[in-house]
Every structure is written in C-alpha cells, then in structure tokens.
C-alpha cells in the first residue's frame, strides 16, 4: 500500500477533483436502479403497464416492446439525481474551489495524495445561518477513489475536517449523505456522527425514493482530547 498524505487543495488538482466527483456520483446509479426496481409503484408499472396494453390492444408484441422500453427509462431515472448533483455542484461551490473554500478563514478544501495522484478529497464551509446558537461547519464532497478504499483515507479526511473545526472554534460539524451510501453512513456513525433527519435534495431523488440523511457531530469546547 503506497503512502498517502493529506494537504490543501491547489489549482493543479482541479482535473483530479472533478474526476473524483463525477466518478463517485456515477457509481451510485446501479444501486439506485436496483432500489427503484423494488418500489411498489415501479412493480405496478412493470407488471400492470404491459398487461393493460395487452388487454387494450390485443398485441403481445406491443406489450413486450413497451415492457422492454421501460428499463432504459428507469435507468435514466436512477442516474438523474446523481448527474443533477454533479451539474449543480460544478455550477456552485465547485465552480471555483479556491474562491469558495480557500479565500476566507473558517473554510478549507483538502485532497489526499498518493504517488503524485489525488485519490481523495473533502471540503468544509461555515454554515451561514444567523438563527443558530452554535458555530457550525459543514463537511462537503468526501470522496475516495475506488482503487484506494479500505485504507483509512476517508476516515483520515473526516478527522482532518474535525480537527480543523476544533482549531477554528466550531461547536458542530454537519454533513449530508444518501441512504444508498451505506458504507459512508457506517463510517460517519462509527466516528460519532448522529442522525438528525432526512429529506430529498431534488425532485429526481424523490421520484426514486433516494433520501438524503443529515448528520451532526458535536464538538464541546471543553473537549480537548484526540479524536
């Protein structure tokens, strides 16, 4: 296993980072597709649609063509929330990472580098909400290249964010992840994050029953030990 070190993002990392984001989102489409196929409304469509068409038209061929054509449409639906997220992100905070994450104190973006390749990343931005009683940091875009997983890189990146939050005087760290991202949820919970709720991040996610789970990590000011 090649050594890996975590450092701040540089502009020369952009191509690597965008690639990680795109690949990381795309790899969730198959699991989303399998989940979509199990939904009651999908089963009704897959079974009832062709049957209804057969009864109306009397054509087995037409019913078969309709049934087969449903699968590309469902695959499109499974991919859409993830492509939508990538497009949205590349138009907002990831459009200029240096400006969004490194131009002001209290925010940062890190990459994990191994053998001169960026194999992981994570960002952190302050939560701008005047109604909050506590100073809160939000973790964004935790990704590790598929070939470098199970090496502790994701945990090291999360620890980097938590330590940064301590150093900057934050009281809480929050993040969002999908219900379909089981390994990510297990990681966060093993590190002390607690669920606070769930929602849908876009209409496409609602269509495929893809919930976003919200987590929080409390950093009491009196706690000075290691993570």
UniProtKB/Swiss-Prot annotation:
| Induction entry | Up-regulated by ceramides.
Q: Which UniProt keywords apply?
A: Acyltransferase, Endoplasmic reticulum, Membrane, Signal-anchor, Transferase, Transmembrane, Transmembrane helix
Q: Which residues form the N-acetyltransferase domain?
A: 61-220
The consequence of residue 143 to S is: No effect on the cysteine S-conjugate N-acetyltransferase activity
Q: In which pathway does it act?
A: Sulfur metabolism; glutathione metabolism
Reactions the enzyme catalyzes: L-lysyl-[protein] + acetyl-CoA = N(6)-acetyl-L-lysyl-[protein] + CoA + H(+); an S-substituted L-cysteine + acetyl-CoA = an N-acetyl-L-cysteine-S-conjugate + CoA + H(+)
What cellular-component terms does GO give this entry? endoplasmic reticulum membrane; endoplasmic reticulum-Golgi intermediate compartment; endoplasmic reticulum-Golgi intermediate compartment membrane; membrane
Topological domain ranges for the Cytoplasmic compartment: 1-42
Question: Can you tell which superkingdom this protein's organism belongs to?
Answer: Eukaryota
List, alphabetically, the Gene3D superfamilies matched: 3.40.630.30
The protein's matches in InterPro entries, at most eight in alphabetical order, are given as: Acyl_CoA_acyltransferase, GNAT_dom, NAT_camello-type
| Localisation | Endoplasmic reticulum-Golgi intermediate compartment membrane; Endoplasmic reticulum membrane
One Pfam match, given by its short name, reads Acetyltransf_1
Provide the membrane topology annotation: Single-pass type II membrane protein
Q: Which GO terms describe its molecular function?
A: L-cysteine-S-conjugate N-acetyltransferase activity; L-lysine N-acetyltransferase activity, acting on acetyl phosphate as donor; N-acetyltransferase activity; protein-lysine-acetyltransferase activity
GO annotation, biological process: amyloid fibril formation; glutathione metabolic process; peptidyl-lysine N6-acetylation; positive regulation of gene expression
Which loops or segments lie on the Lumenal side of the membrane, by the record?
Answer: 64-227
Ranges that cross the membrane: 43-63
Q: What is the effect of changing residue 149 to K?
A: Loss of the cysteine S-conjugate N-acetyltransferase activity. No effect on protein expression
- Give the UniProt tissue specificity note: Preferentially expressed in liver and kidney. Also detected in brain (at protein level).
Indicate the enzyme's highest-level EC class. transferase
Q: What is its EC number?
A: 2.3.1.-, 2.3.1.80
State the CDD domains in the record: NAT_SF (cd04301)
Q: Which family does it belong to?
A: Belongs to the NAT8 family.
Functionally, this protein is described as follows: Endoplasmic reticulum (ER)-membrane-bound lysine N-acetyltransferase catalyzing the N6-acetylation of lysine residues in the lumen of the ER in various proteins, including PROM1 and BACE1, using acetyl-CoA as acetyl donor. Thereby, may regulate apoptosis through the acetylation and the regulation of the expression of PROM1. May also regulate amyloid beta-peptide secretion through acetylation of BACE1 and the regulation of its expression in neurons. N(6)-lysine acetylation in the ER maintains protein homeostasis and regulates reticulophagy.
The protein depicted here goes by the name N-acetyltransferase 8
Show the taxonomic lineage.
Eukaryota, Metazoa, Chordata, Craniata, Vertebrata
